[in-house]
Swiss-Prot record:
Silk fibroin elementary unit consists in a disulfide-linked heavy and light chain and a p25 glycoprotein in molar ratios of 6:6:1. This results in a complex of approximately 2.3 MDa. Keywords: Disulfide bond, Glycoprotein, Secreted, Signal, Silk protein. Residues 1-16 form the signal peptide. One of its GO terms (molecular function) is structural molecule activity. The keyword Zinc does not apply. It comes from Galleria mellonella. This is Fibrohexamerin. It comes from the Eukaryota. It is found in: Secreted. Found in 2 differentially glycosylated forms (29 kDa and 30 kDa). One of its GO terms (cellular component) is extracellular region.
Length: 218
C-alpha cells in the first residue's frame, strides 16, 4: 500500500483538491521530506552521504547515435556541476500507481577524450579520436517510478530534455579526425538527443543515491 508522510500529505491534499489523483507531499527543496516519502515506499537506504562531488571521473562511457551510424567511447569522462542539480518536480499519481521525480541540472559540464567509431555497410569501421568539452545550459531529467509502493530507481526510465544546445570545444588529435569532423551544426539537436538517450541513468542515480535515498545501483 502506498504510504505518505502524513504531515506533508495534509498540506499537499489541501493544495491539490479532493478530486485530484496527483499528490505533492513535499516542497521541492525539502530533500528530507522527499527522502522520507521515497524510502517509505521502497527498499532504498535513507542513510546517504548527502553530497555530490563538484567534479568526478567515469573511466569509460559508451553511447550510440543511430542516426549517424556511429558509436562513441568517452574515455576518462569528467563530469562537473552534477552537484548543482536540483529537484524540479516530485509527485505521486495515486490512481496510476506512479511517482515522478524530475531534476534540473544547470551548466552540466562534460569533458573527455572521445573515440568515434563510424559504421558503414560492407565496409570496415573507421575510428577517429578527439578531445571534447561541452557545457549544457540546462539538462532536465524526468524519472517515472512505477509501482509507487515499491519504487525502484534501478529499473526506472529517465528521460533527458536537452533544453538548449551546448557550448563546446573540440580538439582533434590527428589530421584525419580534423578532416572528418563536420562544421555543419544543423543536425546537432538530433545528435544531442541521441547522446542523452544514454546519459540519464548515470546522472539521476548519482543525484538520488547521493542526496535522497540509495537504491544501490550505479
Amino acid at each position: 500500500m502506498l504510504k505518505f508522510i502524513i504531515f506533508a500529505l495534509t498540506v499537499a491534499l489541501c493544495e491539490a483538491g479532493p478530486a485530484n489523483n496527483v499528490v505533492r507531499p513535499c516542497r521541492l527543496d525539502d530533500l528530507k521530506c522527499i527522502r522520507d516519502n521515497i524510502s517509505a515506499n521502497s527498499n532504498c537506504n535513507a542513510n546517504v552521504r548527502g553530497s555530490i562531488p563538484s567534479e568526478y571521473v567515469i573511466p569509460r562511457f559508451n553511447f550510440e547515435t543511430p542516426f549517424f551510424n556511429a558509436s562513441y567511447i568517452d574515455n576518462n569522462l569528467i563530469i562537473r556541476n552534477n552537484d548543482a542539480c536540483r529537484v524540479s518536480e516530485f509527485f505521486f499519481n495515486v490512481k496510476a500507481d506512479t511517482s515522478v521525480l524530475a531534476v534540473d541540472c544547470p551548466n552540466l559540464d562534460l569533458e573527455s577524450d572521445r573515440t568515434l567509431i563510424q559504421h558503414a555497410s560492407l565496409q570496415e569501421e573507421t575510428t577517429y579520436n578527439y578531445h571534447i568539452r561541452g557545457i549544457y545550459p540546462l539538462i532536465r531529467l524526468t524519472t517515472n517510478l512505477l509501482n509507487a509502493d515499491r519504487l525502484n530507481l534501478c529499473n526506472a526510465f529517465t528521460y533527458a530534455d536537452v533544453t538548449a544546445l551546448p557550448i563546446f570545444k573540440i580538439d582533434p588529435k590527428d589530421r584525419p579526425t580534423a578532416n572528418f569532423l563536420s562544421r555543419d551544426l544543423s543536425l546537432l539537436n538530433i545528435y544531442e538527443r541521441e547522446t542523452f538517450a544514454y546519459r540519464p541513468p548515470q546522472l539521476i542515480r548519482q543525484f538520488v543515491n547521493s542526496l535522497i535515498c540509495d537504491f544501490g545501483c550505479q
